[in-house]
Amino acid sequence: MAAAVAMRGSSSDGGGYDKVSGMDSGKYVRYTPEQVEALERVYADCPKPTSSRRQQLLRECPILANIEPKQIKVWFQNRRCRDKQRKESSRLQAVNRKLTAMNKLLMEENERLQKQVSQLVHENAHMRQQLQNTPLANDTSCESNVTTPQNPLRDASNPSGLLSIAEETLTEFLSKATGTAIDWVQMPGMKPGPDSVGIVAISHGCRGVAARACGLVNLEPTKVVEILKDRPSWFRDCRNLEVFTMIPAGNGGTVELVYTQLYAPTTLVPARDFWTLRYTTTMEDGSLVVCERSLSGSGGGPSAASAQQYVRAEMLPSGYLVRPCEGGGSIVHIVDHLDLEAWSVPEVLRPLYESSRVVAQKMTTAALRHIRQIAQETSGEVVYALGRQPAVLRTFSQRLSRGFNDAISGFNDDGWSIMGGDGVEDVVIACNSTKKIRSNSNAGIAFGAPGGIICAKASMLLQSVPPAVLVRFLREHRSEWADYNIDAYLASTLKTSACSLTGLRPMRFSGSQIIIPLAHTVENEEILEVVRLEGQPLTHDEALLSRDIHLLQLCTGIDEKSVGSSFQLVFAPIDDFPDETPLISSGFRVIPLDMKTDGASSGRTLDLASSLEVGSATAQASGDASADDCNLRSVLTIAFQFPYELHLQDSVAAMARQYVRSIVSAVQRVSMAISPSQTGLNAGQRIISGFPEAATLARWVCQSYHYHLGVELLSQSDGDAEQLLKMLWHYQDAILCCSFKEKPVFTFANKAGLDMLETSLVALQDLTLDRIFDEPGKEALFSNIPKLMEQGHVYLPSGVCMSGMGRHVSFDQAVAWKVLAEDSNVHCLAFCFVNWSFV
């Protein structure tokens, strides 16, 4: 109340007058400038001083001797309120500016759509009139609809000719960015709003594939243009961008001849390149424009020898329109319009080159997200772990991704060459003798003997396997496919100057992996993390040696709401974190071939119960498993890199080939386990072998809870078994069931339980009860076991447990009870963790 009174009576200049509560309504305290300065110094160090601190202030500052302690208290209250008001006012002004800009953007989009509707109505009326008046003149009625061919390539050595092409490119680009040159439709799954990446649209019925995005970013136009022109920094598929010629143009603009190389997304298709003209200029209203188009469909650019591994693609007028925004920031329009020569790839992979949605996700929205990411980092909104600078972590992500792309594409000019196989063409082995791994201690030393890198890679088609589900499983359950000794071999190459196979000691993976988050993008489409794999020595002598392995890992598309065009898990062993750490990238990439309109498959979770809506009604589950999920096709690419010494080249190649084959087999097993068509048919039996069906278990859990505790677990416990199962599955607290054995293993969990453990029903059996509790939790549990056996239930105090990924989870209370079967024998133990959350 005193603060409120003080606020009403305070001056707005920060400290002239203060009205003291409890005093006369007309009595104010006037502070001298010296007194205000002294109080401001204290406020800067401690905005909310205690009573003793205020008393100390009066003693130490004679200038404040004539002010009562109560008046000092009110001054600090008043000062805090003014500070809070200023911050809130600043925040609201920023929000208002953003909403004003978004409103302007939406009004412009609405105006463009109205023009498009008018144009379509006019064309429709014209077409109807033609059909009515000239029914027999079909051969001539279409002449007006023939698309005007692209202008032929003019003399590239003639600057005036290039400037003319640049102006034409600018006009065509603007007609796409803000006009109706292309019939744009909103991309499915993208909902515009203040928190969205922007307004995203894809082409309908035009030549090639095209995408358009517009959004608001908190960066100045010149900075936005600088970032967007540096395409390799944000477009992960861009291998190289080289400017061959630069010609000055009017308004301080430039015309450039640019050669761009793209990576191949998989080993099954060739890479693409572009030979383009890029025009940068300033508009009359102060907007900046960067527009670009191919100079020709083929020919031009570097020599044929350097481009022999590429298919020349065509860029139709595309680019960026960046307009300054009142109050700071920019409104950005991005258009990508390409002809990717889909004829040159196998038919099954052509959707990758014929889908405008793929272009929107890989290029257009990627550019907008990258700008937003940098804007948030610049403003200090993003704070990363371990004190790392955002730019440094972003560099690590780029290096991981680039190394993986290099391995998949295997360009000759990078030193890659194909090695002979063993007669079976399932795994491709490539060798690069020019690529060296340098030690940290001496950057001039690579290996003790000449060597290089061997890459084993394979691609396979997957049917009915949701990509995000597969990548999440590979990330969370490395022991299902990885060989710890191979990881140890790769890690050892960073610590020693020799890559020896015989020097490795056999080790066993303990099954424990700790994931430490480092950074993530704005919408969590990319996550950078460190993974620690705990090794288990086979002999007592080795127990004293540290055998843990650390991996730097980049995950793409594993978020529940991901609707991306590529899902990746890329990693490399690391020994330290200096900027020059060598990264030998390996991993997996899954690319959907059937781009669905609703993006539902990637939001599916790993648990089998979700495909049932949970329960034993397998017939319903089989029917409910989306037909899109069951027919979903994708291509999986696997690439693993191995350093070698020259005299061990053949041995490392054989090891690499066999290792990748074993990974392919493991992925095939996992794919069958998580396929919706399989889970729908067998989910009732798959909850665990020899276990009762889920509906029966749910009934036993609820009945036993009521029997032991005297209260109902669920609000409606008198429904049928399947209804109970659905309610138990969606219950707010985590419910876990474990076997009633000497070493209890988890056998079932509801959705909250799986979220808490960060696992799935497929991998739940890998977790034991003792693994999730810390030491105090284990002591509390073990000390209460006699009580649990005697009375059938026990309450555990609040504490901390561990998820399957090694994260700490706090809970307010836990309840454990015995689950009785029909014959009244103990079938399993059940736990309920109340109000759990990640620490």
UniProtKB/Swiss-Prot annotation:
Task: Specify the species.
Answer: Oryza sativa subsp. japonica
Where does the UniProt annotation locate this protein?
Nucleus
Instruction: Identify the InterPro entries for this entry.
Output: HD, HD-Zip_III, Homeodomain-like_sf, MEKHLA, START-like_dom_sf, START_lipid-bd_dom
The record's annotation in CDD domains points to: bZIP (cd14686), homeodomain (cd00086), START_ArGLABRA2_like (cd08875)
What name does the UniProt record give this protein?
Homeobox-leucine zipper protein HOX10
Coiled coil, from the record = 91-134
Q: Which Gene3D superfamilies match?
A: 3.30.530.20, Homeodomain-like
The record's induction entry says: Repressed by miR166 in the shoot apicam meristem (SAM) region of developing embryo.
| GO function term, MF aspect, one | DNA-binding transcription factor activity
Q: What is the lineage of its organism?
A: Eukaryota, Viridiplantae, Streptophyta, Embryophyta, Tracheophyta
Homology family: Belongs to the HD-ZIP homeobox family. Class III subfamily.
